[in-house]
């Protein structure tokens, strides 16, 4: 079973997830938590060691598409990898690919940060 944890930026997802992780360990629940792959975004750097997340926040129009594709692909890979190696039957996942497409990609399109073809 997969349960996605969604919410606006700054809504308390990280706090909830931290509590959930501690509770799962304490109660020995057959579940795990898969966090958003922020560390992967921070590893994707140019020759100046500026990562893709920093680039996105500095110039959303220029890096909007590159960041959203990177976010989507890294999320899919992390979820697939962790579920394959997990022994648990329940997975709590921070954000879903549906949020990447229907919220962040759409918001970037509506604000002109990415084009229709992108």
PLM region spans:
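Hydrophobic positions on the alpha1 helix immediately C-terminal to the Walker A/P-loop
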Residues: 16, 20
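Hydrophobic anchor at the beta1->P-loop junction of P-loop NTPases
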Residues: 3-5
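PAPS-dependent sulfotransferase catalytic domain
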Residues: 52-92
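The start of beta-strands in P-loop NTPase/AAA+ ATPase cores
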Residues: 1, 31, 89-90
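ATP-dependent NMP and nucleoside kinases share a basic, alpha-helical "lid"
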Residues: 79-118
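Conserved lysine of the Walker
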Residues: 13
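P-loop (Walker A) phosphate-binding loop of NTP-binding proteins
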Residues: 8
